[in-house]
Every structure is written in structure tokens, then in C-alpha cells.
């Protein structure tokens, strides 16, 4: 076969190469931050209320202050720091998110290979026997060998940006996985801290319940002695026994909850239940952060991993629309080949070999596909609208989370103040009731009511103390957790690339 030089091919190639890289479809623009000046209707200028008890310190809101990367260190609890570090290093959810990010990045790099020509080499050798009868001739058959080698190059010109948009989509997916990793790390660290606080709260409730049981047991001994002396009726003894039994019945559920909480802490640290973590907690050993950094509303959309992930999804949908539009335009292909053929491998690269080469350019224009391409474009537009709405919903949820946390901090500070007053009042009332009962001034039923009130107030006080801590965790989590200030290597360099 004879190949003739086509003088127009180089000019055509130059023109197509010049056009390559022009991408159809909308270029992505990150949504601007919401035009709001605060998280709540009124400015946060006042500190929270304070109470003279564990977790009762006043907290101050510092607008515009950045959140530290290891925000849990603000609680000044070394055991808590160790547990969070263990969890971030060993939890399988983190490892899965890291692997998903690596996978997405490799797929994006693989997609980027379409920017370059494809070069392939081939080699074949065969030995054949033919008969003259196959050619309509008489005679004996002939045996011969054929060896060929070739090098082929093909290149799809990205004239309308289908490749560019596909790579853009893959890179946006990698960004999505990056922020999914950040969200996983934030959720994990928050869950560990909250689980530790729940551990401390349950231990406080158990301690209070045991103290109440001890006091009620002592009171039962007193009542029994009085019954022996004829000072009280048997009904009073039975009433005290019933009260003590009811209080004792509240202890096993608390101990069960503590055991389950220990299992949760162990699992979060990436361990099996039989490998229980050594760290234990009490509210008294954990400081309540008094200076609370509150980032500016304009920064929240950049700081929240879930908002950034939603933006990456929006970016991906935007790129997919570009791909769908580009698929409706012509596709241009350049290809070239060079090779040789000989009657044996030994002669393949010698003077006896026959040279082979080819050079071609092609264009494919979609004409009719049953409406597939048009519907794919419309589907991509709908997907972009969906992602935009989901992004807006994520932003609204982010601002609501911050507002909820701020409200909870203020309200629960007042609750603790009131609960402390209630506990102290109930304690004083119980002491007075015991003295009055001993003096015969009140009925035993009045004393029992005072005991029940004090028991409830002790447990409620511990719960109110724990709420101050969990509200603080909720604020740090709602503001994004300071991942941009992280210095640890939990996710190596994958967290910030």
C-alpha cells in the first residue's frame, strides 16, 4: 500500500491544537458567604451566668477569635487528650476516610491522563502454510513466516473541554473526600469528648446515689430504733425501707449505662471491649473553658467540613454539566503509526524489513442518539440545581447549629445556677426535716418527701454540670473544630492538600 502525503494535515493539526482546551459549560464559582453579621438576633456581648460549683464558671464569647486545632486541650484534661489522640490514630472510620481520599486522588490523576497522547507498542510473529488452491492455482503449498512490530500514537483533542471537565469533576470528588475525612475526624473527636463527659457524669450520678443510699440506710436504722422504743409506727419503718429500696433500684441502671459508655469509649479508640481503655473521668478533673472563640459568620462556610464537602459536590455537578454539553459537540482524534514487517524476527530490524507508517485525523459529530445526549444535559442541569439546594441547606444547618450551641450555653448556665440553689435548698430542708422529725414536730411522710426532693436535686445538679461541658463541645463542633490549625499527623498530609 502506498501512503501519499496530505499537505493539509499539519495545518489541520495546528488549528485543532490551538482550539484544544476551550471548555464549554459554566465555569465554577464558589458561592459567596451569607450576608449576615451574627449568629443570633442580638450581639453576644455578655458572659454566661456563673455558679459556685463544678462546671459553673462564667464563659466569655470572643468574636473573631480562631479555634485551636486541638480544641479538646482547652479542657485541660491529660486523660482526655490521650484518648482523643488514640482514637484519631486507631479508629477504623478515620482509616476508611483516608483510604477513600487516596482513592479519589488516584482516580483524579488517572482521569488527567486523558490530557496526554496514548502510545502503544505491539509485536507479533506467525508461521503459516498456504495452498495454491486458495489462490485458484495448482501447485504445492508454501510455508512462510511473518513478523511485525509497530508503535502507535493516538490523541483525542479536547477541543470543547470534555476531558477538562471530566478531570475537574474527578478533582472535585477528591476535594469532597478530603472534607469528608475532616468531618469524620471532627465527629470522632467530638464523640470521644462527649463520651468522656458522659462517663464523668454517670460516675457523678453513681457517687451521689451511693451517698444518698448510705444516708437513707442510716435513717432506716434510726427509724427502726425509734420503732423499737415505740416512737414511730411500723408503717413509718416500711415507708423508709421502701424509699431505700427505690433508691437502690436506681443504681444498677446507672452502672449499666456506665459500662455501656466504657464500651463506647473503647470502640471509639479502635479497640475491642475486652481491651477497655484505662482512662476514667470526673467532672471535677475537667476544666470548663472560660474563653470561647467564636469565628465570624463570614468564615463559617470555609471552616465547616460539611459545608466545604457540599461545595465540592456542587463543583462536581457543575463540571458534569460541562461534560454533558461537550458530548454534544464534535470529537477530534489524531493518530499516527510506525512499524516494520519481515519474514522473520531476525530480519525485523534489518534492511530486509518493510517500513510501515500511517498518519490520520478524524472527526466524529453526534447526529442522532434518540435524544440521549440532550436528556443527559438536562439531567446534569437538574443535578446542578439539586447540589445548589443541598449546599444552601447545609449552610443553613451550619448556622443553626452555632445558634443552638450559643443559646444552650447561655440557658444551661442559668439552669446550673438555679439547680445549685435548688440542691442547696433541698439539702438544708432535709437537715431541718430530720431535726424536726426527731423532735416530733413533723410527720414521717414529710421527711420522706424531703429525702426524695434532695435525691432528685443531687442527680439534677450533676446533669446540669455536665450540660455546660457538652454545650461547649457542641459549639466547637458547630464552628468547624479548627481543623485548619491542626498540627498533628493523624491524616498525614492528606488533611490539608
In which residue ranges do the predicted regions lie?
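Bacterial Sec-pathway N-terminal export signals of envelope proteins
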Residues: 23-108, 285-315, 366-367, 392-395, ...
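Sec/SRP-type N-terminal targeting helices
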Residues: 96, 112-113, 157-185, 235, ...
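Small/polar, glycine/serine/threonine/aspartate-rich low-complexity segments that form flexible
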Residues: 60-62, 66-75, 85, 124-152, ...
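Acidic, low-complexity, intrinsically disordered peripheral segments
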Residues: 263, 273, 288, 460-497
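Amphipathic alpha-helical coiled-coil scaffold segments and their short linker/junction regions
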Residues: 60-61, 65, 73, 88-91, ...
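Periplasmic alpha-helical coiled-coil/stalk elements that build and connect Gram-negative outer-membrane
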Residues: 163, 179-296, 408, 412, ...
Amino acid at each position: 500500500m502506498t501512503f501519499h502525503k496530505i499537505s493539509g494535515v499539519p495545518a489541520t493539526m495546528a488549528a485543532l491544537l490551538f482550539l484544544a482546551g476551550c471548555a464549554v459549560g459554566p465555569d465554577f464559582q464558589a458561592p459567596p458567604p451569607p450576608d449576615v453579621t451574627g449568629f443570633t438576633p442580638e450581639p453576644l456581648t455578655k458572659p454566661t451566668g456563673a455558679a459556685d460549683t463544678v462546671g459553673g464558671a462564667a464563659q466569655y464569647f470572643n468574636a473573631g477569635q480562631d479555634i485551636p486545632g486541638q480544641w479538646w486541650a482547652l479542657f485541660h484534661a491529660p486523660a482526655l487528650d490521650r484518648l482523643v489522640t488514640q482514637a484519631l490514630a486507631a479508629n477504623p472510620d478515620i482509616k476508611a476516610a483516608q483510604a477513600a481520599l487516596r482513592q479519589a486522588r488516584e482516580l483524579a490523576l488517572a482521569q488527567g491522563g486523558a490530557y496526554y497522547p496514548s502510545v502503544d507498542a505491539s509485536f507479533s510473529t506467525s508461521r503459516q502454510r498456504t495452498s495454491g488452491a486458495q489462490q485458484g492455482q495448482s501447485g504445492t503449498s508454501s510455508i512462510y513466516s511473518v513478523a511485525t512490530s509497530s508503535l502507535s500514537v493516538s490523541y483525542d483533542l479536547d477541543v470543547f473541554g470534555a476531558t477538562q471537565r471530566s478531570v475537574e469533576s474527578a478533582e472535585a470528588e477528591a476535594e469532597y473526600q478530603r472534607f469528608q475525612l475532616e468531618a469524620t475526624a471532627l465527629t470522632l473527636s467530638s464523640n470521644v469528648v462527649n463520651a468522656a463527659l458522659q462517663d464523668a457524669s454517670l460516675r457523678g450520678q453513681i457517687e451521689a446515689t451511693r451517698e444518698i443510699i448510705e444516708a437513707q440506710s442510716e435513717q432506716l436504722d434510726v427509724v427502726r430504733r425509734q420503732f423499737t422504743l415505740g416512737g414511730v409506727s411500723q408503717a413509718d419503718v416500711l415507708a423508709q425501707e421502701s424509699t431505700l429500696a427505690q433508691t437502690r433500684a436506681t443504681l444498677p441502671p446507672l452502672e449499666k449505662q456506665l459500662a455501656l459508655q466504657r464500651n463506647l469509649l473503647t470502640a471509639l479508640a479502635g479497640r475491642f471491649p475486652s481491651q477497655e481503655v484505662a482512662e476514667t473521668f470526673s467532672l471535677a478533673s475537667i476544666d470548663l473553658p472560660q474563653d470561647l472563640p467564636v469565628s465570624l459568620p463570614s468564615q463559617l462556610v470555609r471552616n465547616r467540613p460539611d459545608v466545604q464537602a457540599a461545595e465540592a459536590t456542587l463543583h462536581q455537578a457543575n463540571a458534569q454539566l460541562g461534560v454533558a454539553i461537550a458530548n454534544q459537540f464534535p470529537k477530534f482524534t489524531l493518530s499516527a503509526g510506525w512499524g516494520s514487517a519481515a519474514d522473520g524476527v531476525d530480519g525485523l530490524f534489518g534492511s530486509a524489513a518493510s517500513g510501515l507508517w500511517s498518519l490520520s485525523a478524524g472527526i466524529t459529530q453526534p447526529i442522532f442518539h434518540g435524544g440521549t445526549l440532550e436528556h443527559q444535559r438536562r439531567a446534569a442541569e437538574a443535578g446542578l440545581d439539586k447540589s445548589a439546594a443541598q449546599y444552601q441547606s447545609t449552610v443553613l444547618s451550619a448556622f443553626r447549629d452555632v445558634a443552638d450551641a450559643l443559646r444552650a450555653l447561655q440557658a444551661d448556665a442559668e439552669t446550673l445556677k438555679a439547680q445549685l440553689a435548688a440542691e442547696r435548698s433541698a439539702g438544708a430542708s432535709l437537715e431541718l426535716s430530720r431535726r424536726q422529725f426527731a423532735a416530733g414536730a413533723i410527720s414521717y411522710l414529710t421527711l420522706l418527701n424531703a429525702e426524695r426532693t434532695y435525691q432528685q436535686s443531687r442527680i439534677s445538679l450533676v446533669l446540669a454540670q455536665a450540660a455546660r461541658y457538652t454545650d461547649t463541645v457542641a459549639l466547637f463542633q458547630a464552628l468547624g473544630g479548627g481543623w485548619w490549625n491542626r498540627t498533628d499527623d493523624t491524616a498525614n498530609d492528606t488533611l490539608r492538600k
